[in-house]
Amino acid sequence: MGSSDSSSGSAPPRHQPPPPQQGSAPELPPGFRFHPTDEELVVHYLKKKAAKVPLPVTIIAEVDLYKFDPWELPEKATFGEQEWYFFSPRDRKYPNGARPNRAATSGYWKATGTDKPILASGCGREKVGVKXALVFYRGKPPKGLKTNWIMHEYRLTDASSSAATSRPPPVTGGSRAASLRLDDWVLCRIYKKINKAAAADQQRSMECEDSVEDAVTAYPPYATACMTGEGAHGSNYASLLHHQDSHEDNFLDGLLTAEDAGLSAGATSLSHLAAAARGSPAPTKQFLAPSSSTQFNWLDASTVGILPHARNFPGFNRSRNVGNMSLSSTADMAGAGTCAVDNGGGNAMNVMPPFMNHLPVQDGTYHQQHVILGAPLAPEATGAAASAFQHPVQISGVNWNP
């Protein structure tokens, strides 16, 4: 009865959370990362693991690292994205030695540099652990191929640990595995080193791909034109060729039309010139000054002056024989814009030149014929132009001296 009263009067037992299950992944709040310092790894995880004290959180898996290759370890980790943490035992390479066995499945781990001490952050700054860096090599030593896989190995350095690991245990009736055990637990961090040059090349490649995609997005008509051409003509280039052919046809049609218009305008201008010359001869002598603003109109009656008198140059023969034809610079122009050409048989035929600057006839003695066109010449340039070798032309029926 009393026991029941005492039991009833005692406080109810507090509810304690169950210990975390081994191997279950922890649930961290968003934004939290497991990135402990070297001291935290040794003091709060490795020390407690060696003393068999419950850990704050089950976030580090127990794996024998030397039975796997490093690229197989990420899938065996409990937690991690770019780096992975493991508790692993460490064995001796020889039964009577203190050298650890670093052999793995398809390679080996090789230590780089010397061990670095891990100091506590308290006032005493005591040494709590040792950190060693190792690199994984493919193949067999000493001709292994170096890889980018790195391991940081953390070990304890307290008196009991150093005494236990400095000398091999006595060989008794136990198993051989127990005799080779160097450390029950070491904490290892595994990660793959990123090559900066390769990362830069990959970044540039991604930027180039993005720029190409942006260019295609910015200019969709070209892609649409190619797709349309492929469906209509059966080829990606059919639409472009069709567009080019139509452009050339339009260009040639416009050129021929402009040339025909220029010839018609030239013939009409010659008619107006002859009529104006017969009706009211100009009192002065001027050079040809066609309109520069009208395209393809070489002779405009409103802007063309009257041809000057024929001038005689010493030693210059106006009549020359070219082949079977005799060209005379004093040929009569019967009608508007016609010139007489003697073909050697005495029969003269009227020819309508398309332009006033007809093709010159050259010989070995005199320079090429020049026709002065454009704006009115300055007085100082008139003398130089008159002294050049030119074929003067006379128009019959025109009274030059009123």
Swiss-Prot record:
Keyword flag Nucleus: yes
DNA-binding region listed in the record: 128-199
GO BP of this protein: regulation of DNA-templated transcription; system development
Ranges of compositional bias, category Low complexity: 1-13
Keyword DNA-binding: yes
Molecular function GO labels: DNA binding
Region (Disordered), start-end ranges: 1-33
Subcellular location: Nucleus
Domain of life: Eukaryota
Gene3D superfamilies: NAC domain
Domain NAC: 28-193
Cellular-component GO terms for this entry: nucleus
Other known facts: High grain protein content (GPC) is a desirable trait in breadmaking and pasta wheat varieties because of its positive effects on quality and nutritional value while Low GPC is a desirable trait for barley malt and beer production.
Domains as described in the record: The NAC domain includes a DNA-binding domain and a dimerization domain.
Free-text function comment from the UniProt entry: Transcription factor of the NAC family associated with the grain protein content (GPC). Accelerates senescence and increases nutrient remobilization from leaves to developing grains. Sequences of 11 European varieties of H.vulgare tested belongs to the same haplotype while the sequence found in H.spontaneum, an ancestor of the cultivated H.vulgare which has a higher GPC, belongs to an other haplotype.
Name of the protein: NAC transcription factor NAM-2
Organism: Hordeum vulgare subsp. vulgare (Domesticated barley)
